[in-house]
Amino acid sequence: MASSNLIKQLQERGLVAQVTDEEALAERLAQGPIALYCGFDPTADSLHLGHLVPLLCLKRFQQAGHKPVALVGGATGLIGDPSFKAAERKLNTEETVQEWVDKIRKQVAPFLDFDCGENSAIAANNYDWFGNMNVLTFLRDIGKHFSVNQMINKEAVKQRLNREDQGISFTEFSYNLLQGYDFACLNKQYGVVLQIGGSDQWGNITSGIDLTRRLHQNQVFGLTVPLITKADGTKFGKTEGGAVWLDPKKTSPYKFYQFWINTADADVYRFLKFFTFMSIEEINTLEEEDKNSGKAPRAQYVLAEQVTRLVHGEEGLQAAKRITECLFSGSLSALSEADFEQLAQDGVPMVEMEKGADLMQALVDSELQPSRGQARKTIASNAITINGEKQSDPEYFFKEEDRLFGRFTLLRRGKKNYCLICWK
Protein backbone atom coordinates (compact mmCIF):
# COMPACT_ATOMS: atom_id res chain seq x y z
CA MET A 1 0.00 0.00 0.00
CA ALA A 2 1.45 3.33 -1.04
CA SER A 3 1.40 5.70 1.90
CA SER A 4 0.06 8.83 0.17
CA ASN A 5 -3.41 7.43 -0.41
CA LEU A 6 -3.42 4.86 2.39
CA ILE A 7 -6.60 6.24 4.01
CA LYS A 8 -8.43 6.02 0.66
CA GLN A 9 -7.25 2.42 0.24
CA LEU A 10 -8.45 1.52 3.73
CA GLN A 11 -11.81 3.15 2.95
CA GLU A 12 -12.08 1.11 -0.26
CA ARG A 13 -11.68 -2.02 1.85
CA GLY A 14 -14.40 -0.81 4.25
CA LEU A 15 -11.85 -0.54 7.05
CA VAL A 16 -12.56 3.02 8.24
CA ALA A 17 -15.49 3.69 10.58
CA GLN A 18 -14.47 7.18 11.75
CA VAL A 19 -11.41 9.37 11.36
CA THR A 20 -10.53 12.73 12.91
CA ASP A 21 -9.61 15.53 10.51
CA GLU A 22 -9.16 13.22 7.52
CA GLU A 23 -7.71 15.92 5.28
CA ALA A 24 -4.97 16.88 7.75
CA LEU A 25 -4.15 13.21 8.41
CA ALA A 26 -3.88 12.46 4.67
CA GLU A 27 -1.59 15.48 4.34
CA ARG A 28 0.56 14.29 7.26
CA LEU A 29 0.85 10.79 5.73
CA ALA A 30 1.83 12.31 2.38
CA GLN A 31 4.77 14.09 4.08
CA GLY A 32 6.43 10.81 5.05
CA PRO A 33 6.37 7.95 7.55
CA ILE A 34 4.58 8.39 10.89
CA ALA A 35 4.46 6.39 14.12
CA LEU A 36 1.04 5.03 15.10
CA TYR A 37 -0.29 2.77 17.83
CA CYS A 38 -3.05 0.38 18.73
CA GLY A 39 -3.72 -0.85 22.27
CA PHE A 40 -4.61 -4.38 23.35
CA ASP A 41 -5.88 -4.88 26.89
CA PRO A 42 -5.15 -8.25 28.53
CA THR A 43 -8.77 -9.08 29.46
CA ALA A 44 -8.17 -12.79 28.69
CA ASP A 45 -5.19 -15.07 28.08
CA SER A 46 -5.54 -14.73 24.30
CA LEU A 47 -6.63 -12.28 21.64
CA HIS A 48 -9.73 -13.27 19.63
CA LEU A 49 -11.02 -12.57 16.12
CA GLY A 50 -12.33 -9.16 17.16
CA HIS A 51 -8.71 -8.03 17.65
CA LEU A 52 -7.61 -9.17 14.21
CA VAL A 53 -8.86 -6.22 12.13
CA PRO A 54 -7.03 -3.49 14.15
CA LEU A 55 -3.94 -5.74 14.40
CA LEU A 56 -3.88 -6.26 10.63
CA CYS A 57 -4.42 -2.51 10.21
CA LEU A 58 -1.15 -1.92 12.11
CA LYS A 59 0.49 -4.34 9.68
CA ARG A 60 -1.01 -2.49 6.67
CA PHE A 61 0.49 0.77 7.93
CA GLN A 62 3.87 -0.89 8.48
CA GLN A 63 3.82 -2.31 4.95
CA ALA A 64 3.28 1.26 3.72
CA GLY A 65 6.46 2.36 5.54
CA HIS A 66 5.05 3.58 8.88
CA LYS A 67 6.22 2.63 12.36
CA PRO A 68 3.69 0.62 14.43
CA VAL A 69 3.62 0.55 18.22
CA ALA A 70 1.70 -2.36 19.74
CA LEU A 71 0.70 -1.29 23.24
CA VAL A 72 -0.29 -4.02 25.69
CA GLY A 73 -2.31 -2.58 28.57
CA GLY A 74 -0.59 -3.95 31.66
CA ALA A 75 -2.12 -1.06 33.65
CA THR A 76 -5.43 -0.53 31.83
CA GLY A 77 -6.04 -4.30 31.98
CA LEU A 78 -6.11 -3.98 35.77
CA ILE A 79 -8.92 -1.38 35.54
CA GLY A 80 -11.25 -2.52 32.73
CA ASP A 81 -12.72 -0.48 29.88
CA PRO A 82 -16.42 0.31 30.46
CA SER A 83 -17.01 1.32 26.81
CA PHE A 84 -20.40 -0.07 25.70
CA LYS A 85 -20.24 -2.77 28.40
CA ALA A 86 -23.56 -3.48 30.13
CA ALA A 87 -22.00 -4.32 33.50
CA GLU A 88 -18.86 -3.73 35.58
CA ARG A 89 -15.97 -6.01 34.65
CA LYS A 90 -14.53 -8.42 37.19
CA LEU A 91 -11.14 -7.16 38.41
CA ASN A 92 -8.33 -9.65 37.76
CA THR A 93 -5.29 -10.08 40.02
CA GLU A 94 -1.97 -8.44 39.12
CA GLU A 95 -0.37 -11.89 38.65
CA THR A 96 -3.10 -12.97 36.22
CA VAL A 97 -2.92 -9.74 34.21
CA GLN A 98 0.88 -9.94 34.02
CA GLU A 99 0.65 -13.52 32.76
CA TRP A 100 -1.87 -12.42 30.10
CA VAL A 101 0.32 -9.43 29.11
CA ASP A 102 3.18 -11.82 28.30
CA LYS A 103 0.92 -14.11 26.26
CA ILE A 104 -0.66 -11.27 24.27
CA ARG A 105 2.70 -9.66 23.56
CA LYS A 106 3.88 -12.99 22.11
CA GLN A 107 0.69 -13.27 20.05
CA VAL A 108 1.02 -9.81 18.54
CA ALA A 109 4.71 -10.23 17.66
CA PRO A 110 4.42 -12.45 14.52
CA PHE A 111 2.11 -9.95 12.79
CA LEU A 112 4.63 -7.11 12.86
CA ASP A 113 8.26 -6.77 11.81
CA PHE A 114 10.48 -5.75 14.74
CA ASP A 115 13.66 -5.74 12.68
CA CYS A 116 13.28 -3.74 9.46
CA GLY A 117 15.27 -0.58 10.08
CA GLU A 118 13.56 2.80 10.44
CA ASN A 119 10.00 1.52 10.69
CA SER A 120 10.66 -1.48 12.96
CA ALA A 121 7.71 -2.15 15.25
CA ILE A 122 7.85 -1.39 18.98
CA ALA A 123 6.13 -3.33 21.78
CA ALA A 124 5.13 -1.13 24.72
CA ASN A 125 3.33 -1.67 28.03
CA ASN A 126 1.45 1.15 29.77
CA TYR A 127 2.32 -0.30 33.18
CA ASP A 128 5.75 1.25 32.55
CA TRP A 129 4.36 4.76 33.09
CA PHE A 130 1.39 4.05 35.36
CA GLY A 131 2.96 1.42 37.65
CA ASN A 132 4.79 3.92 39.86
CA MET A 133 2.61 7.00 39.34
CA ASN A 134 1.09 8.26 42.59
CA VAL A 135 -2.52 9.35 42.92
CA LEU A 136 -1.69 13.05 43.41
CA THR A 137 0.35 13.17 40.21
CA PHE A 138 -2.48 11.42 38.38
CA LEU A 139 -5.13 13.86 39.64
CA ARG A 140 -3.04 17.02 39.19
CA ASP A 141 -1.23 16.28 35.92
CA ILE A 142 -3.87 14.25 34.08
CA GLY A 143 -7.24 14.65 35.83
CA LYS A 144 -6.95 18.45 35.68
CA HIS A 145 -7.36 18.36 31.89
CA PHE A 146 -10.56 16.29 31.82
CA SER A 147 -14.05 17.76 32.08
CA VAL A 148 -16.49 15.44 33.87
CA ASN A 149 -19.30 17.18 31.97
CA GLN A 150 -17.78 15.96 28.70
CA MET A 151 -16.90 12.53 30.06
CA ILE A 152 -20.47 11.73 31.12
CA ASN A 153 -21.73 12.72 27.68
CA LYS A 154 -19.57 10.16 25.87
CA GLU A 155 -21.75 7.53 24.20
CA ALA A 156 -19.55 4.72 25.52
CA VAL A 157 -20.55 5.32 29.17
CA LYS A 158 -23.93 7.04 28.74
CA GLN A 159 -25.94 3.84 28.79
CA ARG A 160 -24.30 2.72 32.06
CA LEU A 161 -24.97 6.07 33.72
CA ASN A 162 -28.63 5.87 32.76
CA ARG A 163 -29.19 2.41 34.22
CA GLU A 164 -30.36 2.12 37.81
CA ASP A 165 -29.32 -1.52 38.25
CA GLN A 166 -25.81 -1.05 36.80
CA GLY A 167 -24.02 2.21 37.52
CA ILE A 168 -20.35 2.80 36.83
CA SER A 169 -17.59 2.75 39.44
CA PHE A 170 -15.01 5.52 39.72
CA THR A 171 -12.44 2.86 38.75
CA GLU A 172 -13.99 2.21 35.35
CA PHE A 173 -14.98 5.86 34.88
CA SER A 174 -11.29 6.80 35.15
CA TYR A 175 -10.30 4.35 32.37
CA ASN A 176 -10.84 7.12 29.81
CA LEU A 177 -8.10 9.21 31.50
CA LEU A 178 -5.63 6.32 31.44
CA GLN A 179 -6.08 5.58 27.74
CA GLY A 180 -5.97 9.30 27.00
CA TYR A 181 -2.62 9.57 28.79
CA ASP A 182 -1.27 6.55 26.86
CA PHE A 183 -1.60 8.55 23.65
CA ALA A 184 0.11 11.62 25.16
CA CYS A 185 2.90 9.43 26.55
CA LEU A 186 3.53 7.60 23.27
CA ASN A 187 3.45 10.92 21.43
CA LYS A 188 6.24 12.21 23.67
CA GLN A 189 8.31 8.99 23.75
CA TYR A 190 8.03 7.78 20.15
CA GLY A 191 6.44 10.68 18.24
CA VAL A 192 3.20 8.69 17.79
CA VAL A 193 0.65 10.83 15.91
CA LEU A 194 -2.13 8.33 15.16
CA GLN A 195 -4.13 5.90 17.28
CA ILE A 196 -6.21 3.17 15.67
CA GLY A 197 -8.78 0.97 17.39
CA GLY A 198 -12.22 -0.58 17.20
CA SER A 199 -15.22 1.71 16.74
CA ASP A 200 -16.09 1.28 20.44
CA GLN A 201 -12.84 3.14 21.24
CA TRP A 202 -13.82 6.45 19.62
CA GLY A 203 -14.50 8.18 22.96
CA ASN A 204 -11.19 7.03 24.45
CA ILE A 205 -9.27 8.01 21.30
CA THR A 206 -10.70 11.54 21.15
CA SER A 207 -9.83 12.01 24.85
CA GLY A 208 -6.23 11.11 24.03
CA ILE A 209 -6.18 13.58 21.13
CA ASP A 210 -7.42 16.40 23.40
CA LEU A 211 -4.97 15.54 26.20
CA THR A 212 -1.98 15.35 23.81
CA ARG A 213 -2.86 18.79 22.46
CA ARG A 214 -3.13 20.23 25.99
CA LEU A 215 0.05 18.59 27.35
CA HIS A 216 2.35 18.78 24.32
CA GLN A 217 0.62 21.24 21.93
CA ASN A 218 0.79 18.57 19.20
CA GLN A 219 -1.86 17.71 16.64
CA VAL A 220 -2.55 13.97 16.64
CA PHE A 221 -5.21 11.85 14.95
CA GLY A 222 -7.56 8.94 15.52
CA LEU A 223 -8.97 6.30 13.18
CA THR A 224 -11.42 3.55 14.09
CA VAL A 225 -12.12 0.33 12.22
CA PRO A 226 -15.74 -0.85 12.02
CA LEU A 227 -17.34 -3.47 14.21
CA ILE A 228 -17.50 -6.52 11.96
CA THR A 229 -21.08 -7.61 11.31
CA LYS A 230 -22.54 -10.53 9.41
CA ALA A 231 -25.17 -10.16 6.70
CA ASP A 232 -27.64 -12.29 8.69
CA GLY A 233 -27.35 -10.03 11.74
CA THR A 234 -25.68 -12.62 14.01
CA LYS A 235 -22.51 -11.78 15.91
CA PHE A 236 -19.22 -12.20 14.04
CA GLY A 237 -16.36 -14.20 15.58
CA LYS A 238 -18.50 -16.47 17.73
CA THR A 239 -19.31 -20.16 17.32
CA GLU A 240 -21.60 -22.39 19.38
CA GLY A 241 -18.55 -23.08 21.52
CA GLY A 242 -17.91 -19.37 22.18
CA ALA A 243 -15.25 -16.98 20.88
CA VAL A 244 -12.78 -17.92 18.14
CA TRP A 245 -9.34 -17.35 19.71
CA LEU A 246 -5.98 -16.72 18.06
CA ASP A 247 -4.22 -19.06 20.53
CA PRO A 248 -4.05 -22.57 18.96
CA LYS A 249 -4.47 -24.11 22.43
CA LYS A 250 -7.86 -22.38 22.76
CA THR A 251 -9.08 -22.71 19.15
CA SER A 252 -7.22 -25.32 17.11
CA PRO A 253 -5.96 -24.38 13.62
CA TYR A 254 -8.43 -26.94 12.19
CA LYS A 255 -11.40 -25.36 13.98
CA PHE A 256 -10.12 -21.89 12.99
CA TYR A 257 -9.86 -22.95 9.33
CA GLN A 258 -13.36 -24.46 9.44
CA PHE A 259 -14.76 -21.22 10.89
CA TRP A 260 -13.67 -19.37 7.74
CA ILE A 261 -14.75 -22.18 5.38
CA ASN A 262 -18.27 -21.78 6.80
CA THR A 263 -18.46 -18.06 5.93
CA ALA A 264 -21.71 -17.17 4.17
CA ASP A 265 -21.57 -16.17 0.48
CA ALA A 266 -23.08 -12.82 1.49
CA ASP A 267 -20.06 -12.07 3.74
CA VAL A 268 -17.06 -13.73 2.13
CA TYR A 269 -15.88 -11.03 -0.33
CA ARG A 270 -16.22 -8.33 2.34
CA PHE A 271 -14.22 -10.48 4.77
CA LEU A 272 -11.48 -10.95 2.14
CA LYS A 273 -11.10 -7.15 2.17
CA PHE A 274 -10.99 -7.00 5.98
CA PHE A 275 -8.82 -9.99 6.84
CA THR A 276 -6.42 -10.55 3.92
CA PHE A 277 -3.79 -8.60 2.01
CA MET A 278 -5.22 -9.50 -1.40
CA SER A 279 -5.72 -6.46 -3.60
CA ILE A 280 -9.23 -5.16 -4.31
CA GLU A 281 -8.70 -6.17 -7.97
CA GLU A 282 -7.85 -9.77 -7.00
CA ILE A 283 -10.92 -9.98 -4.74
CA ASN A 284 -13.21 -8.55 -7.45
CA THR A 285 -11.80 -10.99 -10.02
CA LEU A 286 -12.38 -13.91 -7.64
CA GLU A 287 -15.98 -12.76 -7.06
CA GLU A 288 -16.57 -12.52 -10.81
CA GLU A 289 -15.09 -16.00 -11.39
CA ASP A 290 -17.23 -17.48 -8.61
CA LYS A 291 -20.38 -15.91 -10.06
CA ASN A 292 -19.70 -17.25 -13.54
CA SER A 293 -18.41 -20.72 -12.61
CA GLY A 294 -21.80 -22.27 -11.84
CA LYS A 295 -20.02 -24.23 -9.07
CA ALA A 296 -19.60 -23.69 -5.32
CA PRO A 297 -17.58 -20.49 -4.74
CA ARG A 298 -13.82 -20.76 -4.20
CA ALA A 299 -13.76 -17.62 -2.05
CA GLN A 300 -14.31 -19.40 1.27
CA TYR A 301 -11.28 -21.63 0.65
CA VAL A 302 -9.14 -18.66 -0.32
CA LEU A 303 -10.26 -16.77 2.81
CA ALA A 304 -9.69 -19.77 5.12
CA GLU A 305 -6.26 -20.40 3.62
CA GLN A 306 -5.10 -16.77 3.81
CA VAL A 307 -6.26 -16.07 7.38
CA THR A 308 -5.17 -19.44 8.80
CA ARG A 309 -1.71 -18.93 7.29
CA LEU A 310 -1.55 -15.40 8.76
CA VAL A 311 -2.46 -16.55 12.27
CA HIS A 312 -1.07 -20.10 12.47
CA GLY A 313 1.68 -20.12 9.85
CA GLU A 314 2.20 -22.56 6.98
CA GLU A 315 2.43 -25.58 9.31
CA GLY A 316 -0.88 -24.75 11.02
CA LEU A 317 -2.57 -24.26 7.66
CA GLN A 318 -1.27 -27.57 6.24
CA ALA A 319 -2.46 -29.46 9.35
CA ALA A 320 -5.92 -27.86 9.06
CA LYS A 321 -6.16 -28.76 5.35
CA ARG A 322 -4.88 -32.30 5.97
CA ILE A 323 -7.48 -32.94 8.70
CA THR A 324 -10.25 -31.45 6.53
CA GLU A 325 -9.26 -33.65 3.57
CA CYS A 326 -8.99 -36.83 5.68
CA LEU A 327 -12.40 -36.31 7.30
CA PHE A 328 -13.92 -35.68 3.88
CA SER A 329 -12.34 -38.73 2.21
CA GLY A 330 -12.62 -41.02 5.24
CA SER A 331 -8.97 -42.10 4.90
CA LEU A 332 -7.04 -41.30 8.08
CA SER A 333 -3.57 -42.60 7.14
CA ALA A 334 -2.11 -39.10 6.60
CA LEU A 335 -3.09 -37.85 10.07
CA SER A 336 -0.37 -37.36 12.69
CA GLU A 337 -0.79 -37.73 16.44
CA ALA A 338 -0.82 -33.91 16.71
CA ASP A 339 -3.67 -33.82 14.15
CA PHE A 340 -5.71 -36.17 16.34
CA GLU A 341 -4.95 -33.94 19.32
CA GLN A 342 -6.50 -31.01 17.41
CA LEU A 343 -9.60 -33.10 16.72
CA ALA A 344 -9.81 -34.07 20.39
CA GLN A 345 -9.45 -30.42 21.44
CA ASP A 346 -12.38 -29.00 19.48
CA GLY A 347 -12.53 -30.53 16.00
CA VAL A 348 -15.21 -33.19 16.48
CA PRO A 349 -17.26 -34.39 19.49
CA MET A 350 -15.03 -36.40 21.83
CA VAL A 351 -15.71 -39.06 24.44
CA GLU A 352 -13.29 -40.73 26.88
CA MET A 353 -13.70 -44.49 27.31
CA GLU A 354 -12.15 -47.35 29.25
CA LYS A 355 -10.50 -50.11 27.23
CA GLY A 356 -12.63 -53.24 26.78
CA ALA A 357 -15.72 -51.41 25.48
CA ASP A 358 -17.78 -52.75 22.60
CA LEU A 359 -18.91 -50.82 19.53
CA MET A 360 -22.58 -50.59 20.58
CA GLN A 361 -21.64 -49.02 23.91
CA ALA A 362 -19.26 -46.59 22.18
CA LEU A 363 -22.05 -45.40 19.86
CA VAL A 364 -24.34 -44.77 22.84
CA ASP A 365 -21.65 -43.09 24.99
CA SER A 366 -20.64 -40.89 22.06
CA GLU A 367 -24.30 -39.95 21.48
CA LEU A 368 -24.09 -41.17 17.90
CA GLN A 369 -27.00 -43.46 18.86
CA PRO A 370 -29.70 -43.12 21.55
CA SER A 371 -29.70 -46.79 22.69
CA ARG A 372 -27.93 -50.13 22.27
CA GLY A 373 -30.96 -51.41 20.34
CA GLN A 374 -30.77 -48.56 17.86
CA ALA A 375 -26.97 -48.94 17.69
CA ARG A 376 -27.36 -52.64 16.78
CA LYS A 377 -29.65 -51.78 13.83
CA THR A 378 -27.38 -48.99 12.60
CA ILE A 379 -24.26 -51.20 12.72
CA ALA A 380 -26.08 -54.01 10.90
CA SER A 381 -27.18 -51.55 8.19
CA ASN A 382 -23.50 -50.88 7.37
CA ALA A 383 -23.68 -47.18 8.38
CA ILE A 384 -20.76 -47.19 10.87
CA THR A 385 -17.04 -46.82 10.18
CA ILE A 386 -14.13 -47.23 12.59
CA ASN A 387 -11.09 -45.19 11.48
CA GLY A 388 -12.55 -45.07 7.97
CA GLU A 389 -13.24 -48.84 7.73
CA LYS A 390 -16.85 -50.14 7.60
CA GLN A 391 -17.92 -52.33 10.51
CA SER A 392 -21.21 -54.26 10.31
CA ASP A 393 -20.83 -56.68 13.26
CA PRO A 394 -23.05 -55.47 16.15
CA GLU A 395 -21.08 -57.66 18.61
CA TYR A 396 -17.75 -56.03 17.67
CA PHE A 397 -15.24 -55.29 20.48
CA PHE A 398 -12.44 -52.79 19.86
CA LYS A 399 -8.99 -54.25 19.19
CA GLU A 400 -5.56 -52.80 19.91
CA GLU A 401 -5.06 -51.86 16.23
CA ASP A 402 -8.21 -49.69 16.40
CA ARG A 403 -6.39 -47.42 18.86
CA LEU A 404 -4.33 -45.15 16.59
CA PHE A 405 -1.17 -43.94 18.36
CA GLY A 406 -2.46 -46.12 21.22
CA ARG A 407 -4.98 -43.39 22.07
CA PHE A 408 -7.53 -42.52 19.39
CA THR A 409 -10.40 -44.17 17.51
CA LEU A 410 -12.56 -42.17 15.10
CA LEU A 411 -16.16 -43.30 14.71
CA ARG A 412 -18.43 -42.12 11.93
CA ARG A 413 -22.16 -42.63 11.47
CA GLY A 414 -23.35 -41.99 7.92
CA LYS A 415 -21.36 -39.38 6.04
CA LYS A 416 -20.93 -36.54 8.49
CA ASN A 417 -21.51 -37.57 12.12
CA TYR A 418 -18.18 -38.06 13.85
CA CYS A 419 -17.03 -38.82 17.36
CA LEU A 420 -13.46 -39.34 18.53
CA ILE A 421 -12.86 -41.88 21.28
CA CYS A 422 -9.92 -41.01 23.51
CA TRP A 423 -8.94 -44.17 25.37
CA LYS A 424 -8.11 -43.85 29.05
Curated annotation (Swiss-Prot):
| Molecular function GO terms recorded | ATP binding; RNA binding; tyrosine-tRNA ligase activity
Compartmental location: Cytoplasm
Give the superkingdom in one word.
Bacteria
- Show where the record puts the motif 'HIGH' region: 42-51
Q: Where is this motif: 'KMSKS' region?
A: 235-239
> What single Pfam family name could you report for this chain, choosing any that match?
SYY_C-terminal
Q: Which family is this sequence assigned to?
A: Belongs to the class-I aminoacyl-tRNA synthetase family. TyrS type 1 subfamily.
Q: Which reaction does it catalyse?
A: tRNA(Tyr) + L-tyrosine + ATP = L-tyrosyl-tRNA(Tyr) + AMP + diphosphate + H(+)
UniProt entry tagged with the keyword RNA-binding? yes
N6-acetyllysine occurs at: K144
Return the broad EC class: ligase
The residues listed in the UniProt record as binding ATP, with positions renumbered to this chain, are K238
Keywords, ordered alphabetically: Acetylation, Aminoacyl-tRNA synthetase, ATP-binding, Cytoplasm, Ligase, Nucleotide-binding, Protein biosynthesis, RNA-binding
What is the protein's given name? Tyrosine--tRNA ligase
